[in-house]
Amino acid sequence: MKVSLGNGEMGVSAHLQPCKAGTTRFFTSNTHSSVVLQGFDQLRIEGLLCDVTLVPGDGDEIFPVHRAMMASASDYFKAMFTGGMKEQDLMCIKLHGVNKVGLKKIIDFIYTAKLSLNMDNLQDTLEAASFLQILPVLDFCKVFLISGVSLDNCVEVGRIANTYNLIEVDKYVNNFILKNFPALLSTGEFLKLPFERLAFVLSSNSLKHCTELELFKAACRWLRLEDPRMDYAAKLMKNIRFPLMTPQDLINYVQTVDFMRTDNTCVNLLLEASNYQMMPYMQPVMQSDRTAIRSDSTHLVTLGGVLRQQLVVSKELRMYDERAQEWRSLAPMDAPRYQHGIAVIGNFLYVVGGQSNYDTKGKTAVDTVFRFDPRYNKWMQVASLNEKRTFFHLSALKGHLYAVGGRSAAGELATVECYNPRMNEWSYVAKMSEPHYGHAGTVYGGLMYISGGITHDTFQNELMCFDTDTDKWTQKAPMTTVRGLHCMCTVGDKLYVIGGNHFRGTSDYDDVLSCEYYSPTLDQWTPIAAMLRGQSDVGVAVFENKIYVVGGYSWNNRCMVEIVQKYDPEKDEWHKVFDLPESLGGIRACTLTVFPPEENPGSPSRESPLSAPSDHS
């Protein structure tokens, strides 16, 4: 039953059901608050029941108001009128921190809940809202500023944000400038940037679509506008990534600038760039803010593998674009690889050993090693292994690579090799007590851990730990399940072992779906949720604290798979998230910071300054 009473704004209506006598009902008016507000505003306009007069600091105009209204909307006025201050008993109060325009805006808002803003009244309104602690007005001012940011006013909006400590607006302005910096350079507004904001922009990994040379020239323009700005030259130049410029650009455009030759800090920056470029093999262990890729785009990356159809080995390097939910290609390897080892040092991707041809016995193992540089989307060859090896594990630890075990035409391997980027050479370290292949490994706490694998055709459950400082192997608590061709990774203080296969009975292989993690502190294994589907000989990577298991081979289904499964350690849950472009076994995966997908890494602006041979000769 619908009941309606009255007309107009004060009318009410409700849908009622018959009820027993004595039942209590509650009613709410949707219009009462606005009617009361309108009533108070009319009283103010007519000067009725006003009990205090406010006077702005910049004039004598008076604003009669009601103390209760002002105190209900502002902590400032509440403290003034109830906190025992002298103004509590005054009938006329001068507000020295607020001007006429700002005070009128605040009073109108308190009485009407409405606010009109433009660039002419914004700062007066902001100043009054900040002084009088009117938070809704501050929020409206922030929205107004953010919604109107453009190339023509971004510098001014940034100044206002800094003046009034509008953190959200300041962050938005920074992001706007970073996204539109090339366009801003072509306007006069660029030269109005304050030093602090320009330095932030030039230091940011989110700055896109500009070469380091273009950034250097822009910084020089800004410095030369006014003589006092030259005092900032050294501080500004520290944000330019000179090591990433070509030697030709350094000579032709940078060294010809006077302060780059006379200022000690700038001279040292050029020396740093020169030293960096002369040591191409050492670069992964020479990384700094000025040598890092100018990108904030980190992605899951996969490399190589053997195709399900025709058993062709892939040389593809791909990254997964999470936003577009699709795979994108990076520069492929010169030669295909599977059963290889990959590891990352200083955001350089190393690809070690493996096989170029499909061969389950490892007789076509190779010893070659290549390094991918995402800054230029290019590969270069580095020193080869001392031994050919496949089905092995590769770890990056303390700026070195460690290639552990594996197999080759000579048989199963127990040897371990260490690559030193500073010397560009491999050397032997302490070998394992027994040969292993198909094992997995990870690093934690400055130590390398190796689990499972196959020794003399027998699947293992042992866990071994290698200390690079003492060059010794030690035995740890074994896994609860024997397994090989599995994967291993570290999340937090836990070492996860996932998937793989082992013998079912005496001769047939079977997927291992069970998973477990090892606690180095407790020397103890704990089971976790089982995989949804079997995967052996996979790629594994930790991305945003989730474990991604990529591709591989399913022994239960007797085929390569394209599935990518994600494990959430916090929830102890597995999910199928997406697929590879094709089914690939013996694939490898990692995370790498690369240029955003919309950029073309192969453009001339990505010319590599490397002086090392790039023809693999």
Swiss-Prot record:
Regions that span the bilayer: none
Residue ranges constituting the BACK domain according to the UniProt record: 154-255
Kelch repeats: 300-347, 348-399, 400-446, 448-493, 495-545, 546-595
Any one GO CC term of the record: midbody
GO molecular function: cullin family protein binding
Gene Ontology biological-process entries: cell division; protein ubiquitination; regulation of cytokinesis
Domain of life: Eukaryota
Domain BTB: 50-119
UniProt region (Disordered), positions on chain: 595-617
Keywords: Cell cycle, Cell division, Kelch repeat, Mitosis, Repeat, Ubl conjugation pathway
Biological role: Substrate-specific adapter of a BCR (BTB-CUL3-RBX1) E3 ubiquitin-protein ligase complex required for mitotic progression and cytokinesis. The BCR(KLHL9-KLHL13) E3 ubiquitin ligase complex mediates the ubiquitination of AURKB and controls the dynamic behavior of AURKB on mitotic chromosomes and thereby coordinates faithful mitotic progression and completion of cytokinesis.
Protein name according to UniProt: Kelch-like protein 9
Organism (species): Bos taurus (Bovine)
Phylogenetic lineage: Eukaryota, Metazoa, Chordata, Craniata, Vertebrata
